[in-house]
Structure formats: C-alpha cells, structure tokens
Amino acid sequence: TAPAAGTVSAINRGAKRILQSVVIDIEGDDEETFKFFSSDELTGLSKDVVINNLVESGLWTALRTRPYSAVPAIDSEASAIFVAAMDTSPLAGDPSVIIAENADSFADGLDVLARLTSGKVYVGKAPGSKIPTGKDSSVTSEEFSGPHPAGLVGTHIHFLSPVSATKTVWTVGYQD
C-alpha cells in the first residue's frame, strides 16, 4: 500500500551508483485514511471490523497460513495464531529490543489478533525476554530456548498446535 500517488521526479545516486533517494512529486491530496481505535476500544472490536481494517490498509497480506504459507482467505478462521517474537538465526538482532520501542502498540496488536481466532494467540519468546502479551486472555506467551531453529515459527507450531490438511494456523511477524 503506497502512502501517496505521484510521479518520480528524481533518482539520486551516490558513489558507485548507490541509491541515496527517490524524489516523488505527490499529486493532489487524496491520501488514504483508516479508522483509528483507542487502546481501550480494541478488545471490543468485532472480527468483521478487524478484517475490514486489515484488508483496506493492505496489512491482511502480512498474515500467512500454515501449512502452505499462503495469505489466508478473508472468510477463513485459524485454529490459532502464532507470533514469533524471537530470532535464533546467526547474527540476528534481539526482537525484545525492537518491541520495547513500541511495547504498548505491540500488546494492542496482539489483542487485535485475538479477535481473528476462537483459539489462542501464541507469542514465542526467548527465556527471560520482556515481551508484552496484551490484555486479552487468549494471548499466551511461550518460551523456547536452544540453537537455531528454536526461534522459527514452524518449530513453535510443531510443539504447540501441529497443523494438518484439515487444521490451519496463521502466523505473523512481530514487526508486522
């Protein structure tokens, strides 16, 4: 989803043709706006309102199904939703540092995800990390430790709610 419509007027490159900036002349003022909900309103939102806002904003495509890693159908429901708030990849940054910058927004996002399933929202985290879980009782935090692939969402799914041809779960990245 683009924040505005316009025409590319300049592409600025530096040494060795490294891209430094792209200048876009914005046409008009027809920006997209979305309904805003306060933190207190989020737990009372209906599933339809959440789905409509995610689809209109283009964020619905951040959700992925397991198995098959496809964008979920709008009329489908996951048996659980997984958020991997840890990364065991070599040289990976610490997600708890990134999440701490907007901890309240992260917790609000988990509460909104809980509207999309009648099951649980699992937040996979490293032992001892300070990851918020929101206000909704269906959001649960699970700790995983060990070398890679302990931080992969597929590992979390395997141990907490294994999928099959008839059972689908959804995943979303912690930065989405």
Could you describe each region identified by the protein language model?
Residues T1-A10:
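Generic structural motif
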Residues G14-D176:
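Buried, small/hydrophobic-residue-enriched core segments of structured protein domains
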